Curated annotation (Swiss-Prot):
GO cellular component: cytoplasm
EC number, as in UniProt: 2.7.11.5, 3.1.3.-
Organism in which the protein naturally occurs: Salmonella typhi
Keyword Hydrolase annotated: yes
Job of this protein: Bifunctional enzyme which can phosphorylate or dephosphorylate isocitrate dehydrogenase (IDH) on a specific serine residue. This is a regulatory mechanism which enables bacteria to bypass the Krebs cycle via the glyoxylate shunt in response to the source of carbon. When bacteria are grown on glucose, IDH is fully active and unphosphorylated, but when grown on acetate or ethanol, the activity of IDH declines drastically concomitant with its phosphorylation.
Localization terms from the record: Cytoplasm
Lineage: Bacteria, Pseudomonadati, Pseudomonadota, Gammaproteobacteria, Enterobacterales
Binding-site residues, ATP: A315, P316, G317, I318, R319, G320, M321, K336
Listed name of the protein: Isocitrate dehydrogenase kinase/phosphatase
Family (UniProt): Belongs to the AceK family.
Single Gene Ontology BP annotation: glyoxylate cycle
Length: 593
């Protein structure tokens, strides 16, 4: 290879990333218009297209590099020089951290995920940690209650870039002040002030105002979800001021926010204070930089591994028929491998399973489906693998594993947030905790269905409980769109003997689902059955599911709330306006999405 080509290749990769992130910002900048026009289907399409942008631009750069090198092979020294030149381009580059991830992606695409070493890749960043600790330009604006909280909030809401009229701005301000007074106390409120992010955070059918509430006792989140009525008027739906509430809003089971972030590292640094429990990976994930979040997630894994002497073990819970799941005892994530052969009742291919996981990545997860990161050629030290797990890997997924002596390479796996399996949780709790879990499970099913997702296998073992007590679906191999399912009532038995027969007396076609059958496996536990019948009996009726299908086919997009229904201003304080459709969830049982 001629000298000087290394710099050209480095510049080509960085220019390719520039093009990708430019398109990323372009799609993101359309969020306000989509919100104001209530173009909810365009919101969903923009979410999918933005996810695809990264891989598309990696592919474009790879083709450019193949043209530049004329298809000639490159040696190790040449690749090291390319990385050196690329590293020299980054100190003054505003998105250096994601540019490093983009370089990694291009390398992996070129070399089919082989020879993934720190010398060739940015396994760890080449730049100082948290380089934007001092933000180069303001990301937020401060507001002080010099003349009271009412004019302060009026300034905040009036400064928003939204062009729609307000339904009743003064009323919403009263509600916010009422909430702050209840939360902080009337005496403390005059000594507090707010810092508000310059950009709104868009997701689903809401525009979120994200801020920091500085109190005498510390800094709290200040989150206002802004919705629009069917008539095109704005209103504030609630005010959230606890770190637990903010953590759920920015949770791993939710779609990525659309927030205009030309300096993503600076925004992540700004968010840390109100989301202290979130890792760097989770913060990048929340603002839509999911590929760099994968890089950060891997770095967090390596750091944990370096400080731990734990061994990988099979994850607790009922062993899956499709996936082999393992973890480290103290680590908050699990590793999932598609088995080489599935149980006989699982009539599907590995390609189908991967397509299901991709569907979840691109779909609105409504707070009820865990996000995943996909890895290829994942290396594990055999000394850190429990012998029982090693035997299981060789038994269930030998075609996915390459033995390199001291290490094994797993050809493909997913990393996902670790949760307590719901079936285990239900065995351990009683009273109100049991009731809350059953309510959460039913709500998860409802909200997934309203988002056009049918879980397929609804057994408790396929759901997990998060640290906030939320129930989240995580087994995707039978997932499908609601519109693909034929929900049927079980026909009346012809003879008394029919109900005792081992085979059904009625025909069953592919895609047929009989909701009455859910009762058999969801209500078998005498502690659970009465609670289910009380709160979620309609899930056993085919007409409930068919009604949801009709709404979906008519183009209706349900509201998704990242908080409990009782926290909404319309429920807490509503006295001076008639209820409207914007405040009515599809079921009275829906609490939080």
């Amino acid at each position: 290879m001629p000298r000087g080509l290394e710099l050209l290749i480095a510049q080509t990769i960085l220019q390719g990333f520039d093009a990708q992130y430019g398109r990323f910002l372009e799609v993101t900048s359309g969020a306000q218009q989509r919100f104001e026009q209530a173009d909810w289907h365009a919101v969903q399409q923009a979410m999918k297209s933005r996810i695809h942008l990264y891989d598309h631009h990696v592919g474009l750069v790879v083709e450019q590099l193949r043209c530049i090198t004329d298809g000639k092979s490159t040696d190790a020294d040449f690749l090291l020089r390319v990385k050196e030149h690329y590293t020299r381009l980054l100190p003054d580059y505003p998105r250096f951290e994601i540019a490093e991830s983009f370089f990694n992606s291009v390398y992996c695409r070129l070399f089919d995920h082989r020879s993934l070493t720190p010398e060739r890749l940015f396994i760890f960043s080449s730049q100082p940690e948290r380089r934007f600790r001092t933000i180069p330009r303001p990301l937020a604006k401060d507001f002080f209650p010099d003349h009271g909280w009412e004019p302060l909030l009026m300034r905040i809401l009036s400064d928003l870039p939204l062009c729609l009229p307000w339904q009743n701005k003064s009323r919403d301000i009263r509600y916010i002040i009422a909430h702050l007074t209840e939360t902080l106390g009337e005496d403390a409120l005059p000594r507090c002030h707010v810092q508000v992010a310059n950009e709104l955070f868009y997701r689903n059918k809401a525009a979120w105002l994200v801020g920091k509430l500085t109190t005498p006792d510390g800094t709290l989140p200040f989150l206002l979800p802004i919705h629009r009525t069917d008539e095109g008027e704005l209103f504030v739906d609630t005010c959230l001021t606890t770190t637990a509430e903010a953590s759920i809003v920015f949770g791993f089971a939710r779609s990525y926010f659309m927030v205009y972030a030309p300096l993503p590292a600076a925004l992540v640094e700004w968010l840390r204070e109100i989301l202290p429990g979130k890792t760097t990976a989770e913060l990048y994930m929340a603002i839509g930089c999911q590929k760099h979040a994968k890089t950060e997630s891997y770095r967090e894994y390596l750091c944990y591994l370096a400080e731990s002497d734990e061994k990988f073990i099979e994850a607790p819970g009922i062993r899956g028929m499709v996936m082999l799941v393992f973890t480290l005892p103290g680590f908050d994530r699990v590793f999932k491998i598609i088995k080489d052969k599935f149980a006989p009742q699982k009539e599907m291919s590995a390609a189908h399973v991967r397509a299901c996981y991709q569907l979840v990545k691109e779909h609105d997860r409504v707070g009820r489906m865990a996000d995943t990161q996909e890895f290829e050629n994942f290396v594990l030290d055999k000394r850190q693998i429990d012998p029982a797990l090693m035997a299981l890997l060789r038994q269930e997924a030998p075609e996915k594993i390459t033995d390199l002596g001291e290490h094994i390479v797993i050809r493909h796996l997913y990393i996902e947030r670790r949760m307590v399996p719901l079936n285990i949780w239900l065995e351990q709790v009683e009273g109100q905790q049991l009731r809350d879990a059953i309510e959460e499970y039913g709500n998860a099913i409802r909200q997934l269905a309203a988002a056009n997702i049918f879980p397929g296998d609804m057994l408790f073992k396929n759901f997990g409980v998060t640290r906030h007590g939320r129930v989240v679906f995580y087994d995707y191999d039978e997932i499908c769109y609601m519109t693909e399912v034929n929900f049927r009532d079980i026909p009346p038995a012809r003879y008394p003997e029919d109900e005792l027969a081992s085979e059904p007396w009625y025909s069953v076609s592919p895609g047929d689902v009989f909701p009455e059958e859910f009762r058999h496996w969801l209500c078998a536990d005498p502690r659970i059955g009465p609670l289910f019948e009380e709160m979620h009996a309609d899930l056993f009726r085919a007409d409930y599911w068919r009604a949801l299908q009709t709404r979906i086919k008519e183009g209706h997009v349900e509201d998704v709330y990242a908080y409990r229904r009782r926290q909404r201003f319309s429920v807490r304080y509503e006295t001076d306006r008639r209820p409207d459709k914007a405040f009515a969830p599809p079921s009275g049982n829906v609490r939080r999405a």
